[in-house]
Every structure is written in structure tokens, then in C-alpha cells.
């Protein structure tokens, strides 16, 4: 058989033309040891901090420790499938999450993957989980209100757009309820919301999502969930992922509100990862950079300057205290980072004052500049009246023969405490809050028993809406109480007082 060179070269050329095998060039390493959600990997010399690496089976890991001869990787999936000697691939990507309108109405995990069973996200943009906070020049002072719909907060510890206001208190006294009410209050505003559940029970997160869906708030809300059963790495990443989603709106000149529920559990997750990575422990066994961990997260909430679009990201971080100890390490850290705190007290909660906000210990360091004039007019004396009432209440417990002025002050204080109570999931618009606080501050409630305040309030709203809509409309439109509105409100409340008197006899 004769071998012809032309034929052979022709066959080789055709085979080269049809050759379509892709060559996968990626830097790989080997797992040296694995345990407790941490893998030591040898051979990834060019790995970057916070880079995602891929283990067999598509499990992702986050590079946290860069050491001389190996890297420490926190695993974000099922650890049982990874063993010593496994190959690890670099992805070349720093941790990123999908952002934009596509994530609204969805429940995602700590890396932005959907977990609500509604199919894949059709997000076109992604954003790095870790971003540098805006500098001093890029910011503007807080000057626009961000309403929570809660009388006690909006009157005495007002929150402005771009502010960081801490919600702090023991377990099971309504911290999440305050945060969820703040989301519900944004229904007819231009604020998008992100709720980050960090280290919560799955049943609790499901309950929050069901509440948001029931009141139509999921349309403008994203829920980022890293539950207690998820790897510590996802619990650590979730707040940063949620923040990146909020920053997308902030940098587009829009407004966003983010709730971190709660940062105590994120700190515990970070402590766990740090100790397993053999980083030196500090106070309460937290790593030395735990303050930086929270400060770099909360500094990303800001009111941006007009040149950069005048957007804002408002943060409501939640911290859980142990037996009311606000002087513990994590609570003091976060108090010093934030622009004020709303302190919830078990004593008030069990006495039936809900939301259980301790007015004396709660402050808002920058919110006053953002408060509407109408609210300033009615809430100006409120804090002082309540503080004096608390003082007199303790004093009155010892003596019964009090002078008329003291009795009047006690009577006024009791009614003010009652009108600051509010049912869950019932945020109020500004005009309704102003109307009831106006009634309290001007003594229109003093003639009625303290236990009839809830009935008085409900009746007053419907009375004003039906018979004096101009008064409510003027407050909503002008955002202040003019002399005409003041006179109209007083006339309306006198008329309603006579009507209400007949109903309680």
C-alpha cells in the first residue's frame, strides 16, 4: 500500500480545523487540611483577599488568610464533601452580589443566590461586597426625614436619610418589630428597603417575609437571609452583601433603608471564623479588628453630595444585649459608630408600653436637623414632659399628698405615655402623628381617663378625616402648623372632646 504525503497532510489539516477542545487554564491548589468550615490550601500563590475559590462539586470558598506557604479559606457550603488532597481552583473574582431592581421582592442568601423558589435572578449588574465608604467631600449633612411611622421614634429620636440609628435591647422585646414597621412606613415613599437577617431562625425570617408580603412591602424590599444553620462565612458576609445592594440605589441618586438584624450574631460568626483561622483573640475572644468590621460596614450608609446624585443609604443596625448590659464590648463599639440609638427596655415591654422605647436613654445625634417643622412644634416639650413625669412618678410612689401642679404634671405624663403606645404593623403618616401629639401637648387629653387613650386616638383620626380634612391636609402639605392650622386643630379637638365625653360615660 502506497502512502501519499499529500493525503496525510490533508487529513491532519482537516482534523486541526475540527479541533474544538477548550483548554481550561486556571491556577489550582491542594487542600492540606479541612475542618470546622475552614480549609488550608497550598499552591494558590496569586490568590487575593476576599477572592472566591472553587472546591470540587462547585462549592465556593472565601479567601481570608494569606500566609507565606498556604491560604486560609472559609467554606460557604457543605464541608463534608471536601477532603484532604482535593483540588481547589481560583475564580479570579472578588466576592460580588447581584444588584438593582431585579433583586427587589426576592429572598437571597449571603452571596446573592435566590432561595425563595421563584427562579433565577435576572439582574444585569453585580457589585463587590466590600466597597470603600464615601469620603468627607462626597457626603452631605443629613437633612431629610426618613419616617419610621412610630410616634415615639419620629417625635423624639427622629431618623434622617443617610443616618445610622442603632436599635438596641434584650431578646424578645420588639427590636425586629420596630425595624419591620420602618419598612412598612416606606410604602408610599421613594425609599427602597433591604432587610438582612443574620443568624436568625428560619421560622423568624419566614414570618418577617410573610408580614412584608401581607402588607405589600415586598414590592420595594429585598431580604438577605443567612440563618443560624448556614455556614458562619455566609452569616459574616450577609450584611456586606445587603449593603452593596443598598449602595446601588444610593449611588444612582435614589434612597434606600437597610436593616441589619442583628450585628451581634454577625460578630459571633466573625469571631468563630477568626479563631479557626488562628488569628489572635482580644477582649471577649473577639479578634482585634472587630471594631473595623462594623465601622467599615456602617460608614457605607451616607447622604451623598448633590454632585454625586444626592442619594442616601440609611442604616438601622440591631444589637442584642445580655440582661440590659449596654457596656459590653460589641454594644459599646456599635453605639460609638452610630449616630444615635433607640433603647428598648424589658421593664416597659412587660408593663405594656409597646414599642418599649426608653425615651431617656434613646438619642438621635443628627436626626433633629431632618425633623419636619410640624413635628418639632409638637414634640419640643414632649421629651421634657416625659422626663419630668418619670422623675415625679418615682417620687409620687412615696407620698400621697401632692400639690395640684404636681398632680397635673403626673396626669399629663400618664396620658403622653399612653399615646406613644402603638400596635405592631400600624405605622402612622406624619399628619396623624402630629395631630395626636398636638392634642397631648395642649392638654386636650387631660380630661379623659388614661386607659381610654387608644379609643380616643382611633376616634380622633376618623373625626378629623371626616369633619376637618383641611386641618390634616394642611399639615401634610405645609409640613408645619401655621396659626390658622393651630386654631383649626384646637377648634376640632374641642368639638371632638365633647363628642368623646359622651361615649365614655
From Swiss-Prot:
It comes from the Bacteria. The keyword Glycoprotein does not apply. Its EC number is 7.1.2.2. InterPro entries: ATP_synth_asu-like_sf (IPR023366), ATP_synth_asu_C (IPR000793), ATP_synth_asu_C_sf (IPR038376), ATP_synth_F1_a_nt-bd_dom (IPR033732), ATP_synth_F1_asu (IPR005294), ATPase_a/bsu_AS (IPR020003), ATPase_F1/V1/A1_a/bsu_N (IPR004100), ATPase_F1/V1/A1_a/bsu_N_sf (IPR036121). It is an enzyme of class 7 (translocase). It catalyses: ATP + H2O + 4 H(+)(in) = ADP + phosphate + 5 H(+)(out). ATP binds at residues 169-176. F-type ATPases have 2 components, CF(1) - the catalytic core - and CF(0) - the membrane proton channel. CF(1) has five subunits: alpha(3), beta(3), gamma(1), delta(1), epsilon(1). CF(0) has three main subunits: a(1), b(2) and c(9-12). The alpha and beta chains form an alternating ring which encloses part of the gamma chain. CF(1) is attached to CF(0) by a central stalk formed by the gamma and epsilon chains, while a peripheral stalk is formed by the delta and b chains. PANTHER family: ATP SYNTHASE SUBUNIT ALPHA, MITOCHONDRIAL (PTHR48082:SF2). Belongs to the ATPase alpha/beta chains family. This is ATP synthase subunit alpha. It comes from Desulfatibacillum aliphaticivorans.
Amino acid at each position: 500500500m502506497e502512502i501519499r504525503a499529500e493525503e496525510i497532510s490533508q487529513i491532519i489539516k482537516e482534523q486541526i480545523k475540527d479541533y474544538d477542545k477548550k483548554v481550561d487554564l486556571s491556577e489550582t491548589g491542594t487542600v492540606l487540611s479541612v475542618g470546622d468550615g475552614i480549609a488550608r490550601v497550598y499552591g494558590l500563590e496569586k490568590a487575593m483577599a476576599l477572592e472566591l475559590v472553587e472546591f470540587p462539586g462547585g462549592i465556593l470558598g472565601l479567601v481570608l488568610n494569606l500566609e507565606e506557604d498556604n491560604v486560609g479559606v472559609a467554606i460557604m457550603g457543605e464541608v463534608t464533601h471536601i477532603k484532604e488532597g482535593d483540588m481547589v481552583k481560583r475564580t479570579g473574582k472578588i466576592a460580588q452580589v447581584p444588584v438593582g431592581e431585579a433583586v427587589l421582592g426576592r429572598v437571597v442568601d449571603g452571596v446573592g443566590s435566590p432561595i425563595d423558589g421563584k427562579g433565577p435572578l435576572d439582574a444585569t449588574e453585580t457589585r463587590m461586597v466590600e466597597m470603600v465608604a464615601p469620603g468627607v467631600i462626597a457626603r452631605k449633612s443629613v437633612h431629610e426625614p426618613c419616617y419610621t411611622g412610630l410616634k415615639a421614634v419620629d417625635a423624639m429620636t427622629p431618623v434622617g436619610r443617610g443616618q445610622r440609628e442603632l436599635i438596641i435591647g434584650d431578646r424578645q422585646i420588639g427590636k425586629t418589630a420596630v425595624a419591620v414597621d420602618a419598612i412598612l412606613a416606606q410604602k408610599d415613599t421613594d425609599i427602597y428597603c433591604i432587610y438582612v437577617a443574620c443568624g436568625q431562625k428560619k421560622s423568624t425570617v419566614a414570618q418577617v417575609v410573610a408580614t412584608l408580603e401581607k402588607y405589600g412591602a415586598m414590592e420595594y424590599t429585598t431580604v438577605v437571609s443567612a440563618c443560624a444553620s448556614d455556614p458562619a462565612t455566609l452569616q459574616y458576609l450577609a450584611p456586606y452583601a445587603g449593603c452593596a445592594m443598598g449602595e446601588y440605589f444610593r449611588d444612582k441618586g435614589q434612597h434606600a433603608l437597610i436593616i441589619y438584624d442583628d450585628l451581634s450574631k454577625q460578630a459571633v460568626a466573625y469571631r468563630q471564623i477568626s479563631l479557626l483561622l488562628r488569628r489572635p483573640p482580644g477582649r471577649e475572644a473577639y479578634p482585634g479588628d472587630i471594631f473595623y468590621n462594623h465601622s467599615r460596614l456602617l460608614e457605607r450608609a451616607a447622604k451623598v453630595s448633590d454632585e454625586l446624585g444626592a442619594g442616601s443609604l440609611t442604616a438601622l443596625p440591631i444589637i442584642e444585649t445580655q440582661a440590659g448590659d449596654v457596656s459590653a464590648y460589641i454594644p459599646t463599639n456599635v453605639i460609638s459608630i452610630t449616630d444615635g440609638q433607640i433603647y428598648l427596655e424589658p421593664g416597659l415591654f412587660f408593663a405594656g408600653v409597646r414599642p418599649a422605647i426608653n425615651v431617656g436613654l434613646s438619642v438621635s445625634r443628627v436626626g433633629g436637623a431632618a425633623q419636619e417643622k410640624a413635628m418639632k412644634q409638637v414634640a419640643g416639650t414632649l421629651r421634657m414632659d416625659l422626663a419630668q413625669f418619670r422623675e415625679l412618678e418615682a417620687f409620687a410612689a412615696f407620698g400621697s399628698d401632692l400639690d395640684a401642679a404636681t398632680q397635673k404634671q403626673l396626669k399629663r405624663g400618664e396620658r403622653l405615655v399612653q399615646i406613644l403606645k402603638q400596635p405592631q404593623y400600624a405605622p402612622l403618616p406624619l399628619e396623624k402623628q402630629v395631630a395626636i401629639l398636638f392634642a397631648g401637648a395642649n392638654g386636650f387629653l387631660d380630661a379623659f381617663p388614661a386607659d381610654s387613650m387608644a379609643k380616643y386616638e382611633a376616634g380622633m383620626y376618623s373625626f378629623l378625616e371626616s369633619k376637618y380634612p383641611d386641618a390634616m391636609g394642611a399639615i401634610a402639605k405645609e409640613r408645619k402648623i401655621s396659626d390658622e392650622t393651630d386654631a383649626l386643630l384646637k377648634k376640632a379637638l374641642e368639638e371632638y372632646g365633647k363628642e368623646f365625653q359622651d361615649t365614655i360615660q
